[in-house]
A protein has these predicted regions:
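N-terminal binding-site loop/beta-alpha segment at the start of enzyme catalytic domains
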Residues: 1-73, 131, 137
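Glycine/proline-rich, positively charged
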Residues: 24-30, 41, 85-202, 209-216, ...
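Structured C-terminal cap/extension of enzyme domains
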Residues: 41-48, 64-65, 184-371
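Short beta->alpha linker loops
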Residues: 51, 55, 149-150, 249, ...
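Short, well-ordered alpha-helical microsegments
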Residues: 56-60, 151-156, 254
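Short acidic, glycine/proline-enriched helix-loop-strand junctions
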Residues: 67-74, 142, 194-195
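Short hydrophobic/aromatic-enriched beta-strand-loop microsegments
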Residues: 71-74, 164-171, 265-271
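A short, structured active-site edge motif that brings together acidic residues
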Residues: 71-84, 110-113
């Protein structure tokens, strides 16, 4: 069994380890407790939460904080700028609520959450990094960083302006890195010698559920490996990556990730070629790049289940068996008031989408497909 009790997540030369992302926890808290026990019992200890992850902080209080010694785990939490109306008052109020929700006296890692160009002026005018540094001086934060979803130029400005940031959390996966902008983010982090915590290594599950032709490529090569393990392995081996977060929602996913890290080996040239073949198949699939983070849900005045609508659209488009009518039936089981058809295109959901999706426009595609 591996033991990461003394793992230095701030040392970019260290081999990456597995982190427990809590965005998609099961509703059953007893199941979460079993997952936490298994995670810690296998020597892993980095657990990531956020104020906006539904009941995640409270669940960790029950499943982790009340049941395990404080020196057996690290917790990362986040400051969401878009939920603040004034600083420092709202920062203090939200931070104290996070401590109360988690039952912790301090956070091991704390991030300014989901930064992009739209938050730049707020971050600088309110000196959110400076406020976090003050909490660090008080011992309430041990290590400070930020998570990022913007363009390359702003990422470099952040890295230059804020040397007080000790690490960066980036979306990294073989789809976004090999065919998207994520390689540029990765190169910048390496340039500034920043340790990288990886989020969305499986891109919200979309790299665990590939189109049949793409899945066939990987299964013929390695029939006993899960599809998701390819995505996890790719990100874990990237330079400067010290932790790969996986938003696990059941014990099967937990055990699969543990197996992947236990058997971690560099990808061969043939395996790299296979991933490029998979990407060629994915290029034929015009899906919606939603990762089901649900950051948009709190902004919708009609409580439309945006993530579920996009997931069903992608499932139907991905299905080459001719059974997409099954997905359509499931979609129509959603109450009409929560379906894509109810969207009034107000755009309130758009600003907080980390993937920068034009949600109202994409909802139109959902309506058209399932009408």
């Amino acid at each position: 069994m591996k033991n990461y009790s003394s793992h230095d997540y701030l040392n970019p030369a260290k081999q990456a380890t597995l982190g427990f992302g809590t965005m998609r926890l099961p509703k059953d808290r007893a199941e979460t407790a079993r997952m936490v026990d298994t995670f810690l019992g296998n020597g892993y200890n980095y657990i990531d939460t956020a104020y906006i992850y539904t009941n995640s902080e409270e669940t960790l209080k029950e499943a982790l904080v009340k049941r395990h010694p404080r020196d057996s785990y690290f917790v990362a939490d986040k400051l969401p700028p878009w939920m603040l109306k004034k600083c420092p008052e709202d920062c203090v109020k939200l931070f104290e609520e996070q401590l109360r929700r988690t039952g912790l006296e301090y956070f091991d890692y704390y991030l300014v959450h989901s930064l992009d160009e739209g938050k730049e002026q707020q971050v600088e005018d309110w000196d959110l990094f400076g406020w976090c540094v003050e909490q660090k001086k008080k011992g309430l934060i041990k290590h400070l960083g930020f998570s990022y979803h913007g363009g390359t130029a702003y990422l470099e400005r952040l890295l230059k302006r804020h040397p007080e940031s000790e690490f960066v959390q980036l979306q990294q996966n073989y789809l976004d890195n090999l065919r998207g902008p994520a390689t540029e983010w990765h190169e910048l982090a390496v340039k500034y010698n920043q340790p990288i915590i990886v989020m969305e290594p499986v891109k919200g599950g979309s790299l665990a559920k590939l189109p049949p032709a793409a899945e066939k490529l990987l299964k013929e090569y390695a029939p006993n490996r899960s599809i998701a393990s390819w995505a996890i392995q790719y990100t874990a081996l990237l330079q400067n990556v010290t932790c790969v977060l996986s938003g696990m929602s059941n014990m099967e996913q937990m055990n699969d990730n543990l197996k992947t890290f236990e058997d971690m080996k560099p990808l061969t040239a043939q395996e790299h070629d296979l991933l490029n073949q998979v990407l060629n198949e994915l290029a034929k699939f015009a899906g919606i790049p939603c990762t089901a983070c649900k950051y948009c849900h709190g902004d919708c005045p009609l409580n439309i289940d945006i993530a579920a609508s996009f997931a069903m659209y992608n499932d139907a488009k991905r299905d080459e068996s001719g059974n997409s009518w099954n997905t359509a039936m499931v979609y129509k089981s959603i109450p009409e008031s929560n379906r894509a058809e109810a969207c009034i295109k107000c755009g309130a959901c758009v600003a907080n989408c980390p993937q920068h999706i034009d949600i109202p426009a994409e909802m139109g595609k959902v309506v058209e497909l399932f009408k």
